[in-house]
Amino acid sequence: MAQRVTYRRRNPYNTRSNKIKVVKTPGGKLVAQHVKKAASRVKCGDCGSALAGISTLRPRQYAQVSKTHKTVQRAYGGSRCANCVKERIVRAFLIEEQKIVKRVLKEQQDKEKKAAKKTGKK
């Protein structure tokens, strides 16, 4: 009959955080080794693609690694991918340009109205 293996921690249930791997020791015994959950890649907040240059760790482990493992040297580094940052910059620039054009057109209309009022009075 096969040797039985028991959990080594207090939780007796087969949950996602209590997974085990059965391993044979050099002495021939079967023992349970608790397996850590697999880490997932950090994703871009806009498009959801995996971020390059950032370590793949469990959330708690990010506190124990240096800042260079968690970010890249760019605006929104470690939060957004390069393509989304580029899009944001272009969008912000175009919005500012639109505001300037709107302001210039409004000033021109005001000048035309004032000129029309002056010619109407004479």
Swiss-Prot record:
Protein name: Large ribosomal subunit protein eL34
GO CC terms: cytosolic large ribosomal subunit
Compartments reported by the entry: Cytoplasm
GO MF annotation terms: structural constituent of ribosome
Function recorded in the entry: Component of the ribosome, a large ribonucleoprotein complex responsible for the synthesis of proteins in the cell. The small ribosomal subunit (SSU) binds messenger RNAs (mRNAs) and translates the encoded message by selecting cognate aminoacyl-transfer RNA (tRNA) molecules. The large subunit (LSU) contains the ribosomal catalytic site termed the peptidyl transferase center (PTC), which catalyzes the formation of peptide bonds, thereby polymerizing the amino acids delivered by tRNAs into a polypeptide chain.
Keywords for this protein: Cytoplasm, Ribonucleoprotein, Ribosomal protein
Entry-linked Pfam families: Ribosomal_L34e
Family, similarity comment: Belongs to the eukaryotic ribosomal protein eL34 family.
GO BP term, example: translation
Quaternary context: Component of the large ribosomal subunit. Mature ribosomes consist of a small (40S) and a large (60S) subunit. The 40S subunit contains about 32 different proteins and 1 molecule of RNA (18S). The 60S subunit contains 45 different proteins and 3 molecules of RNA (25S, 5.8S and 5S).
Keyword Membrane: no
InterPro entries on file: Ribosomal_eL34, Ribosomal_eL34_C_sf, Ribosomal_eL34_CS
PROSITE patterns per record: RIBOSOMAL_L34E
Entry annotated with the keyword Plastid: no
